[in-house]
Amino acid sequence: LSSQVTQELTALMDETMKELKAYKSELEEQLSPVAEETRARLSKELQAAQARLGADMEDVRSRLAQYRSEVQAMLGQSTDELRARLASHLRKLRKRLLRDVDDLQKR
């Protein structure tokens, strides 16, 4: 009886393993196209994201160049205005100094 049970158990295990291998093969066949489709879709999405990122980075680069130009122009104007005011003050100081020197010489 024990030998018969062992044989039946072995046969059942072998049959179950064969069914499991067949199911595995069937599942792999079914999933292979799905996996390939998923890989292709992900690849497309990554390429699109990379293109968008590249475009966004180029936009940022362009905007930064524009802002830099604007800041340089503003700084240039500020520098020119400061230079003009300083020149005006220096002229006034020179006139005052010359007047004071003239007054001192007259004394």
From Swiss-Prot:
Please give the subunit comment from the record: Homotetramer. May interact with ABCA1; functionally associated with ABCA1 in the biogenesis of HDLs. May interact with APP/A4 amyloid-beta peptide; the interaction is extremely stable in vitro but its physiological significance is unclear. May interact with MAPT. May interact with MAP2. In the cerebrospinal fluid, interacts with secreted SORL1. Interacts with PMEL; this allows the loading of PMEL luminal fragment on ILVs to induce fibril nucleation.
Q: Report what the Swiss-Prot or TrEMBL entry states about this protein's PTMs.
A: APOE exists as multiple glycosylated and sialylated glycoforms within cells and in plasma. The extent of glycosylation and sialylation are tissue and context specific. Glycated in plasma VLDL.
**Gene name for this UniProt entry:** APOE
Q: Which UniProt keywords apply?
A: Chylomicron, Endosome, Extracellular matrix, HDL, Heparin-binding, Lipid transport, Lipid-binding, Oxidation, Phosphoprotein, Repeat, Secreted, Transport, VLDL
Q: Which organism is it from?
A: Saimiri sciureus (Common squirrel monkey)
Please tell me where this protein is predominantly located: secreted
List-wise, which residues carry Phosphoserine? S78
What subcellular compartments does it reside in?
Secreted; Secreted, Extracellular space; Secreted, Extracellular space, Extracellular matrix; Extracellular vesicle
Please report the name of this protein according to its UniProt entry. Apolipoprotein E
